[in-house]
A protein has these predicted regions:
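Tubulin/FtsZ superfamily GTPase core signature
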Residues: 1-111
Length: 111
């Protein structure tokens, strides 16, 4: 049995790499700079300044009402509540996506 990659518009796989928090955003920035192609990059953060310098194609500021763009202050509970607040934005970014890779540092509040 042979396997191959089909070509054509119906065979395109929509892949997203999502960087969450400062560490995840750093990974996304590095992947963009290295020329990684064939994927869409999304930066997700509570810190508005970090998003402003992100190289990601799509940027989602989560917890805008809760953190006022100031970050989660290394508090995972603030990060969780921020994600819940922005659930609809996150879901919209994932529409029509076939595969998602999430990168996060796991050392602060958001990632």
């Amino acid at each position: 049995m042979a396997f191959g990659l089909e070509t054509g518009p119906e065979s395109v796989v929509n892949i997203k790499v999502i960087g969450v928090g400062g560490g995840g955003n750093n990974v996304v920035n590095r992947m963009v700079r290295s020329g990684t192609r064939g994927v869409d990059f999304v930066a997700v953060n509570t810190d508005k300044q970090a998003l402003n310098v992100s190289s990601a194609t799509y940027k989602i500021q989560i917890g805008e009402k809760l953190t006022h763009g100031q970050g989660a202050g290394s508090d995972p509970e603030v990060g969780r509540k921020s994600a819940e607040e922005s659930r609809n934005q996150i879901a919209k970014a994932l529409e029509d996506t076939d595969m998602v890779f999430i990168t996060a540092g796991m050392g602060g509040g958001t990632g």
